[in-house]
């Protein structure tokens, strides 16, 4: 999603691979997978992002997600 990241491609790809493996293990259909991942995002935003930054971080995340879907 990000043009520049403080994380290596290896770190990102490893995490993605593990997350997708869990969804596959549970034979999760696309809608359930998106619901679960969305709930994970909500949990992270509510518990790991300071309240005063949540709106901006949420907007940045949504914009990056939208752009990544358009560019694929």
From Swiss-Prot:
InterPro entries: UPF0352 (IPR009857), YejL_sf (IPR023202)
Alphabetical list of Pfam families matching this protein: DUF1414 (PF07208)
Domain of life: Bacteria
Protein family (similarity comment): Belongs to the UPF0352 family.
NCBIfam families: PRK13689.1
Protein name, UniProt field: UPF0352 protein swp_2271
Organism: Shewanella piezotolerans (strain WP3 / JCM 13877)
